[in-house]
Amino acid sequence: MSLVNNEFSKKQAIFTVSDANYAVMALTMFDSVSEHYPEIDLFLFVVGKGNVDKIDNNINVIYIHDILDDIDLSQRISYYLQVELATSFRPQCFEHLFSHNYDSAIYLDPDLYIFRRMTEVDELLEDGASGVVTPHALKTVRSNVAVIGDETFLKCGIFNLGFLALNCTSETLRMLSWWKDKLKWQCVADSRLGLFVDQKWLDLLPTYFDGFEILKSPLYNLAPWNSEHYSVISDLHGKFYIDNFDNPIAFIHFSGVRRASNHFSFLK
Protein backbone atom coordinates (compact mmCIF):
# COMPACT_ATOMS: atom_id res chain seq x y z
CA MET A 1 0.00 0.00 0.00
CA SER A 2 1.34 3.42 -0.92
CA LEU A 3 0.94 6.61 1.07
CA VAL A 4 0.71 8.68 -2.08
CA ASN A 5 -2.83 7.43 -2.78
CA ASN A 6 -4.16 8.86 0.51
CA GLU A 7 -4.73 5.32 1.82
CA PHE A 8 -3.06 5.81 5.19
CA SER A 9 -2.82 3.00 7.68
CA LYS A 10 -0.48 4.93 9.97
CA LYS A 11 -0.90 7.89 12.27
CA GLN A 12 1.34 10.71 11.08
CA ALA A 13 2.34 14.19 12.23
CA ILE A 14 4.22 17.15 10.82
CA PHE A 15 5.69 19.66 13.25
CA THR A 16 8.00 22.60 13.71
CA VAL A 17 9.66 24.40 16.61
CA SER A 18 9.43 28.17 16.99
CA ASP A 19 9.24 31.01 19.44
CA ALA A 20 6.14 33.21 19.50
CA ASN A 21 7.74 35.90 17.32
CA TYR A 22 8.47 33.43 14.51
CA ALA A 23 5.09 31.71 14.67
CA VAL A 24 3.65 33.70 11.75
CA MET A 25 6.23 32.24 9.39
CA ALA A 26 5.45 28.79 10.80
CA LEU A 27 1.79 29.40 10.02
CA THR A 28 2.66 30.08 6.37
CA MET A 29 4.59 26.82 6.24
CA PHE A 30 1.66 24.94 7.81
CA ASP A 31 -0.73 26.45 5.27
CA SER A 32 1.36 24.96 2.48
CA VAL A 33 1.44 21.60 4.25
CA SER A 34 -2.33 21.55 4.78
CA GLU A 35 -2.94 22.09 1.08
CA HIS A 36 -1.19 18.83 0.24
CA TYR A 37 -1.58 16.86 3.50
CA PRO A 38 -5.05 17.70 4.83
CA GLU A 39 -5.20 14.36 6.66
CA ILE A 40 -2.02 14.81 8.74
CA ASP A 41 -1.96 16.30 12.25
CA LEU A 42 0.06 19.50 12.65
CA PHE A 43 2.02 20.52 15.75
CA LEU A 44 3.77 23.73 16.76
CA PHE A 45 6.22 23.33 19.64
CA VAL A 46 6.73 26.76 21.20
CA VAL A 47 9.99 27.78 22.88
CA GLY A 48 9.93 30.51 25.52
CA LYS A 49 7.18 32.86 26.58
CA GLY A 50 4.39 34.15 24.40
CA ASN A 51 0.85 32.97 23.83
CA VAL A 52 0.11 31.48 20.42
CA ASP A 53 -2.82 29.27 21.42
CA LYS A 54 -5.18 30.96 18.95
CA ILE A 55 -2.84 30.91 15.97
CA ASP A 56 -4.95 28.36 14.06
CA ASN A 57 -7.56 25.84 15.15
CA ASN A 58 -5.98 23.17 12.93
CA ILE A 59 -2.57 23.43 14.61
CA ASN A 60 -1.89 21.71 17.92
CA VAL A 61 0.22 24.02 20.10
CA ILE A 62 2.57 22.47 22.66
CA TYR A 63 4.85 24.51 24.90
CA ILE A 64 8.31 23.13 25.47
CA HIS A 65 8.06 23.84 29.19
CA ASP A 66 5.18 21.35 29.34
CA ILE A 67 7.25 18.42 28.04
CA LEU A 68 10.58 19.09 29.80
CA ASP A 69 11.14 19.09 33.54
CA ASP A 70 11.77 22.50 35.11
CA ILE A 71 15.38 21.83 36.09
CA ASP A 72 16.40 20.64 32.63
CA LEU A 73 14.70 23.60 30.97
CA SER A 74 16.15 26.21 33.33
CA GLN A 75 19.64 24.80 32.86
CA ARG A 76 19.34 25.00 29.08
CA ILE A 77 17.97 28.55 29.21
CA SER A 78 20.93 29.69 31.30
CA TYR A 79 23.48 27.81 29.18
CA TYR A 80 22.40 28.13 25.56
CA LEU A 81 21.97 30.99 23.12
CA GLN A 82 18.48 31.30 21.60
CA VAL A 83 19.16 29.29 18.43
CA GLU A 84 21.03 26.64 20.40
CA LEU A 85 18.18 26.41 22.89
CA ALA A 86 15.49 26.00 20.25
CA THR A 87 17.35 23.25 18.39
CA SER A 88 18.29 21.33 21.54
CA PHE A 89 14.69 20.13 22.05
CA ARG A 90 14.10 18.45 18.72
CA PRO A 91 14.60 14.83 19.91
CA GLN A 92 12.09 15.39 22.72
CA CYS A 93 9.53 16.67 20.22
CA PHE A 94 9.82 13.49 18.17
CA GLU A 95 9.66 11.37 21.33
CA HIS A 96 6.58 13.24 22.51
CA LEU A 97 4.73 12.51 19.28
CA PHE A 98 5.82 8.87 19.24
CA SER A 99 4.69 8.48 22.86
CA HIS A 100 1.25 9.65 21.72
CA ASN A 101 0.99 6.83 19.19
CA TYR A 102 2.22 8.56 16.06
CA ASP A 103 3.86 6.05 13.74
CA SER A 104 5.87 8.66 11.87
CA ALA A 105 6.68 12.34 12.21
CA ILE A 106 8.25 14.93 9.94
CA TYR A 107 10.03 18.03 11.18
CA LEU A 108 10.01 21.10 8.91
CA ASP A 109 11.68 24.44 9.55
CA PRO A 110 9.25 27.38 9.71
CA ASP A 111 10.91 28.91 6.64
CA LEU A 112 10.07 26.00 4.33
CA TYR A 113 7.24 26.02 1.81
CA ILE A 114 5.67 22.83 0.44
CA PHE A 115 4.58 22.77 -3.22
CA ARG A 116 3.35 19.17 -3.53
CA ARG A 117 3.10 15.93 -1.59
CA MET A 118 6.52 14.61 -0.62
CA THR A 119 5.91 11.40 -2.52
CA GLU A 120 9.47 10.12 -2.39
CA VAL A 121 9.60 10.59 1.40
CA ASP A 122 6.19 9.00 1.91
CA GLU A 123 7.26 5.92 -0.02
CA LEU A 124 10.53 5.53 1.90
CA LEU A 125 8.70 5.73 5.21
CA GLU A 126 6.02 3.30 4.03
CA ASP A 127 8.75 0.89 2.95
CA GLY A 128 10.07 0.86 6.52
CA ALA A 129 12.97 3.31 6.56
CA SER A 130 14.00 4.42 10.03
CA GLY A 131 14.17 7.96 8.70
CA VAL A 132 14.97 10.23 5.78
CA VAL A 133 17.49 13.08 5.59
CA THR A 134 18.49 15.45 2.78
CA PRO A 135 22.04 16.74 2.11
CA HIS A 136 22.82 20.43 1.95
CA ALA A 137 24.11 19.99 -1.60
CA LEU A 138 24.43 17.28 -4.24
CA LYS A 139 27.26 18.97 -6.14
CA THR A 140 30.25 21.02 -5.10
CA VAL A 141 29.44 24.61 -4.18
CA ARG A 142 32.24 27.06 -4.86
CA SER A 143 32.93 29.45 -2.00
CA ASN A 144 34.07 32.20 -4.38
CA VAL A 145 30.62 32.17 -5.99
CA ALA A 146 28.34 31.62 -3.02
CA VAL A 147 28.57 32.91 0.52
CA ILE A 148 28.10 29.31 1.60
CA GLY A 149 30.43 26.73 0.07
CA ASP A 150 31.79 23.23 0.62
CA GLU A 151 33.90 24.44 3.52
CA THR A 152 30.77 25.61 5.28
CA PHE A 153 29.17 22.16 5.02
CA LEU A 154 32.24 20.68 6.73
CA LYS A 155 31.51 23.00 9.65
CA CYS A 156 27.71 22.95 9.84
CA GLY A 157 26.97 19.39 8.71
CA ILE A 158 26.38 17.22 5.66
CA PHE A 159 22.62 17.11 6.15
CA ASN A 160 20.27 20.06 6.44
CA LEU A 161 17.94 19.48 9.35
CA GLY A 162 15.37 21.94 8.14
CA PHE A 163 13.77 18.66 7.14
CA LEU A 164 13.85 15.38 9.06
CA ALA A 165 11.40 12.49 8.64
CA LEU A 166 11.34 9.62 11.14
CA ASN A 167 9.42 6.39 11.54
CA CYS A 168 8.83 5.18 15.07
CA THR A 169 11.12 2.14 14.97
CA SER A 170 13.36 0.66 17.65
CA GLU A 171 16.37 1.98 15.75
CA THR A 172 14.87 5.46 15.57
CA LEU A 173 14.17 5.47 19.29
CA ARG A 174 17.75 4.40 19.93
CA MET A 175 18.98 7.26 17.74
CA LEU A 176 16.74 9.78 19.49
CA SER A 177 18.03 8.69 22.89
CA TRP A 178 21.63 9.13 21.72
CA TRP A 179 20.89 12.47 20.04
CA LYS A 180 18.99 13.77 23.06
CA ASP A 181 21.91 12.93 25.33
CA LYS A 182 24.33 14.81 23.06
CA LEU A 183 22.13 17.90 22.83
CA LYS A 184 21.65 18.39 26.55
CA TRP A 185 25.04 20.12 26.85
CA GLN A 186 26.57 19.98 23.37
CA CYS A 187 24.05 21.74 21.15
CA VAL A 188 26.39 24.66 20.54
CA ALA A 189 27.60 26.45 17.43
CA ASP A 190 31.37 26.26 17.92
CA SER A 191 33.57 25.32 14.97
CA ARG A 192 36.55 24.93 17.29
CA LEU A 193 34.76 21.99 18.90
CA GLY A 194 33.51 20.66 15.57
CA LEU A 195 29.92 21.31 16.63
CA PHE A 196 27.01 23.07 14.98
CA VAL A 197 23.93 22.92 17.21
CA ASP A 198 21.86 19.74 16.66
CA GLN A 199 22.77 19.39 13.00
CA LYS A 200 26.44 18.39 12.93
CA TRP A 201 25.79 15.39 15.18
CA LEU A 202 23.77 13.68 12.48
CA ASP A 203 26.80 13.40 10.21
CA LEU A 204 27.24 10.20 12.24
CA LEU A 205 23.75 8.95 11.40
CA PRO A 206 24.61 6.63 8.45
CA THR A 207 27.38 4.84 10.33
CA TYR A 208 25.93 4.67 13.85
CA PHE A 209 22.37 3.66 12.96
CA ASP A 210 20.62 1.43 10.43
CA GLY A 211 17.76 2.11 8.07
CA PHE A 212 18.23 5.84 7.51
CA GLU A 213 17.85 6.90 3.89
CA ILE A 214 19.69 9.82 2.29
CA LEU A 215 17.33 11.39 -0.24
CA LYS A 216 19.59 12.73 -2.98
CA SER A 217 17.12 14.76 -4.99
CA PRO A 218 17.37 18.40 -6.09
CA LEU A 219 13.58 18.54 -5.74
CA TYR A 220 13.97 18.58 -1.96
CA ASN A 221 15.48 21.36 0.13
CA LEU A 222 16.22 23.72 -2.74
CA ALA A 223 17.91 26.62 -0.94
CA PRO A 224 20.28 29.57 -1.40
CA TRP A 225 23.29 27.35 -0.76
CA ASN A 226 22.58 24.88 -3.61
CA SER A 227 20.43 26.76 -6.13
CA GLU A 228 23.36 27.84 -8.33
CA HIS A 229 23.33 24.40 -9.97
CA TYR A 230 19.72 24.44 -11.11
CA SER A 231 17.45 26.28 -13.51
CA VAL A 232 14.16 26.92 -11.71
CA ILE A 233 11.01 27.55 -13.75
CA SER A 234 7.38 28.07 -12.75
CA ASP A 235 3.98 27.47 -14.27
CA LEU A 236 0.82 29.57 -14.22
CA HIS A 237 -0.38 27.82 -11.04
CA GLY A 238 2.53 28.92 -8.86
CA LYS A 239 4.32 25.57 -8.94
CA PHE A 240 8.07 25.42 -9.38
CA TYR A 241 10.20 22.98 -11.34
CA ILE A 242 13.86 22.21 -11.95
CA ASP A 243 14.99 22.36 -15.60
CA ASN A 244 11.64 21.22 -17.05
CA PHE A 245 8.03 20.57 -16.12
CA ASP A 246 8.74 16.89 -15.42
CA ASN A 247 10.61 17.80 -12.20
CA PRO A 248 8.23 19.42 -9.71
CA ILE A 249 9.94 20.83 -6.62
CA ALA A 250 8.67 19.35 -3.35
CA PHE A 251 9.75 22.20 -1.11
CA ILE A 252 11.97 25.25 -1.04
CA HIS A 253 13.95 26.30 2.01
CA PHE A 254 13.74 30.09 2.21
CA SER A 255 16.63 30.35 4.63
CA GLY A 256 17.66 33.94 5.25
CA VAL A 257 14.27 35.44 4.42
CA ARG A 258 13.17 38.12 6.89
CA ARG A 259 10.09 40.29 6.84
CA ALA A 260 10.70 44.02 6.36
CA SER A 261 7.56 46.20 6.58
CA ASN A 262 5.17 44.86 3.91
CA HIS A 263 7.65 42.82 1.92
CA PHE A 264 10.16 40.07 2.41
CA SER A 265 13.86 40.53 1.83
CA PHE A 266 16.54 37.93 1.31
CA LEU A 267 19.45 38.35 3.70
CA LYS A 268 22.56 36.27 3.14
Regions found by a protein language model. Give the residues of each.
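Glycosyltransferase catalytic domains, chiefly GT-A lineage
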Residues: 1-268
